[in-house]
């Protein structure tokens, strides 16, 4: 079950930027960034059309988030989970409040 009430729990603030906890579904029919919120895992759900081979899904994830937040893809790093569906991303160049605002607007669509 997906809910959008507490998606802020997936976002944390650090001195170097923000961390967003993400759960990726690669090889989906359509690209959906974000596609929902998993309240049990406290992760923003994302659907990617690229398969998880040779970093293609990670590349698509970073490019999609950069476009969503209006920042350079070089400001997004996979902090942990590069080879997992559960990823922790370090994002520079946006504040916690900007992330909540942008993701919240997309999740309510």
From Swiss-Prot:
InterPro entries: DUF167, YggU-like_sf. SUPFAM superfamilies: YggU-like (SSF69786). Pfam families: DUF167 (PF02594). Gene3D superfamilies: YggU-like (3.30.1200.10). It comes from the Archaea. Belongs to the UPF0235 family. NCBIfam families: DUF167 family protein. This is UPF0235 protein MA_4097. It comes from Methanosarcina acetivorans (strain ATCC 35395 / DSM 2834 / JCM 12185 / C2A).
């Amino acid at each position: 079950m997906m809910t959008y009430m507490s998606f802020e729990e997936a976002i944390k603030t650090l001195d170097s930027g923000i961390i967003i906890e993400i759960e990726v579904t690669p090889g989906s029919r359509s690209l959906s960034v974000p596609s929902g919120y998993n309240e049990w895992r406290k992760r923003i759900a994302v659907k990617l059309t690229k398969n998880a081979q040779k970093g293609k899904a990670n590349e698509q994830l970073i490019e999609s988030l950069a476009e969503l937040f209006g920042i350079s893809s070089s400001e997004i790093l996979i902090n942990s989970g590069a080879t997992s569906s559960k990823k922790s991303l370090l994002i520079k160049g946006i504040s916690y409040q900007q992330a909540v605002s942008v993701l919240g607007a997309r999740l309510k669509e």
